Regions:
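Short, hydrophobic/aromatic alpha-helical segments in well-folded domains
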Residues: 38, 233, 262-263
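Conserved small/polar residues in nucleotide/adenosyl-binding loops
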Residues: 181, 279-281
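Conserved pre-motif I regulatory segment
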Residues: 215-244
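Residue-level preference for the first positions of well-ordered beta-strands
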Residues: 51, 244-246, 274-276
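Conserved SF1/SF2 helicase motif Ia
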Residues: 265-279
Length: 281
């Protein structure tokens, strides 16, 4: 395997992250590898397992700096440390600006791009231009982590590189990384107890159907009858072929529940794993 570096044997100190309930720390290398495995698993759903895995390895490399370790061991008396820019810089040197964006923003959110003149602030260019020397030098990561120099990207990404497709891919990779990081952190600080599996769309649809049966069978008034008709149509419509649909219903027509009914029905019918609700604020 081509790699940016190879592990150099036993390190001179223990590099740590999250304080656990028993008073010990999670090894930083363990966290990096766990997040890489999870991010790769999540990204496999859209053909990016290798890319997700490498992004996970990159995400907390900045914690290998002396200041990063001081912060992990004594957060009450140590200033916050930017531990994300280091991994973003390595990703950029590999030509991987998808991962650079995801890593730079895995706590603060995806950054604006900025321009090469930025030498401060939160833009991606500013983060990539940041000088990481002295106590912020993270190069000790080379004693523990091996970063693949090359990974396979999804074929669909290379097929048509329009801006919307690239932006969506960056967001998907970012989401995989953030979920993986939070899940492994949660497991560590809860004493090794991983979060249980959530309900499947099929099970949620069963619960929804049980909840709305009385409304469908005996609507209380004319308005409720109209709402029930809309709801029933959405439940049936969810079984149509997989695709993009719109729902046009007047105010008071029960759009919230009916749209949920369609989404769960559609997900259950087509083996989809998640329902996302997007709300304008």
């Amino acid at each position: 395997m081509d790699a940016v570096c190879t592990k150099k044997g036993k390190n001179e100190m223990d590099y740590v992250t999250h304080l656990k309930p028993d008073g010990t720390y999670q090894p930083l290398r363990e966290h990096e590898e766990n997040v890489a495995a999870l991010a790769g698993e999540f990204a496999a759903a859209f053909g990016a397992q290798e890319h997700g895995h490498r992004t996970g390895l990159l995400h907390d490399i900045g914690k290998y700096s002396a200041n990063g370790q001081k912060r992990q061991r004594d957060p009450a008396h140590t200033a916050k440390v930017d531990h994300a820019s280091a991994g973003a810089q390595i990703a950029a040197r590999l030509g991987d600006y998808y991962a650079a964006c995801a890593v730079a923003g895995h706590h603060s959110g995806l950054p604006d791009w900025g321009d090469d003149s930025n030498d401060g602030g939160g833009t991606l260019c500013a983060r990539l231009n940041k000088c990481l020397t002295g106590g912020n030098d993270p190069s000790a990561w080379k004693t523990e982590i091996e970063i693949p120099a090359k990974v396979r990207f999804p074929a669909w990404l290379a097929a048509e590189k329009d801006a919307r497709r690239l932006a969506m891919y960056t967001r998907m990779l970012f989401s995989c990384l953030v979920d993986a990081d939070y899940l492994d952190t949660e497991t560590a600080i809860q004493g090794g107890q991983p979060r249980g599996e959530g309900e499947t769309p099929e099970r949620l649809l069963e619960k929804l159907n049980a909840h709305v049966v009385p409304w469908l069978e005996a609507p209380a008034n004319d308005l409720c009858a109209k709402r029930s008709a809309i709801l029933a149509r959405c439940l049936r419509g969810g079984e149509d072929k997989r695709g993009l649909y719109t729902l046009t219903v007047p105010t008071g027509g029960g759009k919230t529940l009916s749209s949920l009914a369609f989404a769960l029905s559609h997900a259950a019918k087509h083996g989809m794993k998640r329902v996302l609700s997007l709300i304008h604020i």
